[in-house]
């Protein structure tokens, strides 16, 4: 039987075909996002489809927002993957939202965001903070909107926190016992947590801080230190689920956000020490309330043909350049990507505000680097200009 699961506020459904075991999981996997079950409507294009296979307890799963080959999964993994697709369906219908691959935990009335870094422990640390009484907005995806005034607003999706299994060796017996007591649906890879008083879909909090996690293998104290904003930007560049948004718009709002939201690195080994460190640091926040209309994002233009670059080169009109933490970031006019410039690339970019010939650029480099052979400088410049042209940042003068 075909069923459509309609999540409140979304037009596109999750479509289930002979997938009752997955349907039974949804109230526990997404307890805070109200949804209703209806007979499938052929006129509606689903954001994700799950079909029961002949083999017992297996389901063929297909993401229809970012099409890829269907994959066979068990019921828990099918529900997990559907929640990831839900994080793409939300901004697909709301042009004011981008979704970050990150965890977000409420502390003293603001959200502390932990951008995804492989094996850094964001989900486990989020669970440890939940155990200490802090509400988890998400362990995996944080939707953000950007009001005209004040910090960005983070939004809950009402999805239950999920832990990767097995738990890390650094987790103590008390944490293991707590997880066992609150565990919901699980398989060998993941365990969802049944937690009381968690935020419902649509609940918002101002962003308080970005915290880059640095989990240590050996024992040691937890340490929180301020870092430059570009370190957060470098991480966030690769953690945006909303890939159809115009990169110039994203660069604009992130530059403003990172100018006002502090960035830290948390080095830690044990969970309890990390929780204590975060609680000590984030007891209160500076005054400031988000207000005004939220930014709306243009869509990127991926089909545009880029012009060939000849002997004379210049910046292409319509690009966006922003300095974040002392580092220059550029977005092309079509909004297809954001690019970090090193010192040399930034200097060349500034020179190309006016049309310049390649030989003129080599001459400038020869003055700046007299100990490097002209042939090498010319080769390095050619490679840099080719990369800038491929990124759509420079064009013919």
Question: Language model features by range: what are they?
Answer:
Residues 122:
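Conserved lysine of the Walker
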Residues 125-126:
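Post-Walker A alpha-helix
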Residues 289-290, 334-397:
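Long, charge-rich, low-complexity alpha-helical segments
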Residues 1-81, 85-86, 280-289, 301-306, ...:
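Long, basic/Gly/Ser/Thr-rich N-terminal segments
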Residues 4, 8-12, 17-26, 103-108, ...:
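Glycine-rich, often acidic-flanked micro-motifs
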Residues 227-243, 322, 326, 332-350:
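Low-complexity, glycine/alanine/valine/leucine- and proline-rich hydrophobic stretches
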Residues 79-99:
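N-terminal pre-Walker A segment at the start of P-loop NTPase domains
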């Amino acid at each position: 039987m075909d069923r459509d699961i309609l999540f409140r506020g979304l037009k596109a459904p999750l479509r289930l075909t002979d997938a009752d075991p997955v349907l039974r999981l949804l109230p526990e996997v997404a307890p805070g996002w109200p949804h209703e079950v209806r007979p499938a409507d052929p006129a509606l294009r689903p954001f994700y489809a799950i079909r029961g296979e002949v083999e017992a307890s297996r389901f063929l799963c297909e993401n229809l927002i970012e099409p890829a080959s269907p994959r066979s999964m068990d019921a828990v993994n099918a529900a997990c993957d559907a929640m990831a697709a839900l994080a793409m369906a939300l901004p697909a219908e709301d042009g004011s939202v981008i979704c970050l691959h990150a965890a977000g935990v409420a502390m003293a009335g603001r959200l502390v965001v932990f951008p995804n870094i492989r094996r850094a422990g964001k989900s486990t640390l989020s669970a440890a903070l939940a155990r200490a009484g802090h509400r988890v907005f998400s362990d995996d995806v944080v939707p953000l909107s950007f009001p005209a005034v004040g910090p960005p607003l983070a939004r809950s999706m009402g999805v239950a926190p999920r832990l990767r299994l097995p738990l890390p060796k650094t987790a103590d017996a008390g944490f293991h016992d707590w997880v066992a007591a609150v565990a919901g649906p699980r398989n060998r890879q993941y365990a969802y947590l049944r937690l009381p008083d968690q935020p419902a879909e649509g609940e918002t909090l101002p962003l308080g801080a970005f915290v880059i996690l640095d989990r240590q293998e050996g024992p040691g104290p937890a340490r929180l230190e301020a870092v430059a904003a570009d370190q957060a930007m470098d991480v966030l560049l690769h953690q945006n689920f909303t890939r159809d948004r115009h990169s110039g718009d994203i660069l604009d709002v992130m530059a403003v956000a990172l100018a006002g939201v502090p960035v830290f690195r948390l080095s830690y080994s044990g969970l309890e020490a990390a929780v204590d460190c975060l609680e000590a640091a984030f007891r209160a926040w500076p005054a400031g309330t988000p207000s005004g209309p939220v930014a709306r994002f243009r869509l990127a233009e991926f089909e545009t043909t880029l012009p060939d670059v000849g002997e004379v080169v210049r910046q292409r009109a319509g690009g966006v350049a922003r300095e974040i933490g002392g580092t220059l970031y550029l977005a092309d006019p079509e909004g297809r990507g954001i690019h970090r410039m090193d010192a040399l690339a930034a200097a060349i970019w500034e020179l190309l505000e006016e049309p310049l010939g390649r030989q003129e650029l080599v001459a400038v480099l020869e003055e700046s680097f007299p100990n490097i052979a002209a042939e090498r400088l010319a080769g390095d410049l050619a490679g840099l200009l080719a990369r800038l042209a491929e990124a759509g940042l420079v064009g013919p003068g």
